[in-house]
Amino acid sequence: MKDVREEYHADGLIEATLHDDPLEQARRWVDEAIEAELPLPNAITLATVSANGQPSSRVVLLKGIENQGFTFFTHYDSRKGEEIAANPKVSFTMFWQPFDRQMIVIGEAQKVDQEESDSYFASRPYASQVSAAISPQSRPASREWLEAEVSRLEQEFPSAPVPRPEQWGGYRIIPTEIQFWHGRPSRLHDRFRYVKQGDGCWQRERLAP
């Protein structure tokens, strides 16, 4: 692996083109990735930390960027859910390789209200509703048991909507720091950090690559 290298050829990131609001800048980058039909343009690598300080990470899908923060949905009883309950400080990274772009978000995760979770769950495909309802996420389970539970719930609810399980819902990550990275030749990458100030405004600065 030591000989695997990627040279970047993009023009980089011009500070004057950055929005003063990093959440709006994040929307721009995600929208551009979606419009370019990149694979999984809304995928984030979410890092959480357990009560004893052990970090873990996994890929989840971002489902919204609002004025307050970034929203995703999951099982509250999963490992990430339990770790967020113990320590709501989280971080995630988004990487769009064809664009030589990376975004890092640091903040705290808060549960969204039940109405928002209900609304999104109802919008999911029927099969996704069923699998979410039966899955004891992050717990040991055999394939046979999972398939039997799917069959049982499909008989109980042969069509959508399936009731949203209480242990499934959304989180909104309220950011305190957002970084935007853009690859450039010779590893002289562009990197800008926004830090939220006490008055709610954002301060932007360039970081060395």
From Swiss-Prot:
UniProt-listed InterPro entries: Pyridox_Oxase, Pyridox_Oxase_N, Pyridoxamine_oxidase_dimer_C, Split_barrel_FMN-bd
BP GO annotations: pyridoxine biosynthetic process
Oligomeric and partner information: Homodimer.
Reactions accelerated catalytically: pyridoxamine 5'-phosphate + O2 + H2O = pyridoxal 5'-phosphate + H2O2 + NH4(+); pyridoxine 5'-phosphate + O2 = pyridoxal 5'-phosphate + H2O2
Cofactor binding note: Binds 1 FMN per subunit.
Cell membrane among keywords: no
GO molecular function: FMN binding; pyridoxamine phosphate oxidase activity
Species name: Alcanivorax borkumensis (strain ATCC 700651 / DSM 11573 / NCIMB 13689 / SK2)
Protein's name according to its UniProt entry: Pyridoxine/pyridoxamine 5'-phosphate oxidase
Keyword list, A-Z: Flavoprotein, FMN, Oxidoreductase, Pyridoxine biosynthesis
UniProt superkingdom: Bacteria
UniProt KW Nucleus keyword: no
Function in brief: Catalyzes the oxidation of either pyridoxine 5'-phosphate (PNP) or pyridoxamine 5'-phosphate (PMP) into pyridoxal 5'-phosphate (PLP).
EC main group: oxidoreductase
Binding positions (FMN): 58-63, 73-74, 79-80, 102, 137-138, 181, 191
Required cofactor names: FMN
UniProt: substrate binding residues: 5-8, 63, 120, 124, 128, 187-189
Organism phylogeny: Bacteria, Pseudomonadati, Pseudomonadota, Gammaproteobacteria, Oceanospirillales
Family statement drawn from the similarity comment of this UniProt entry: Belongs to the pyridoxamine 5'-phosphate oxidase family.
Pathway as given in its UniProt record: Cofactor metabolism; pyridoxal 5'-phosphate salvage; pyridoxal 5'-phosphate from pyridoxamine 5'-phosphate: step 1/1; Cofactor metabolism; pyridoxal 5'-phosphate salvage; pyridoxal 5'-phosphate from pyridoxine 5'-phosphate: step 1/1
EC number: 1.4.3.5
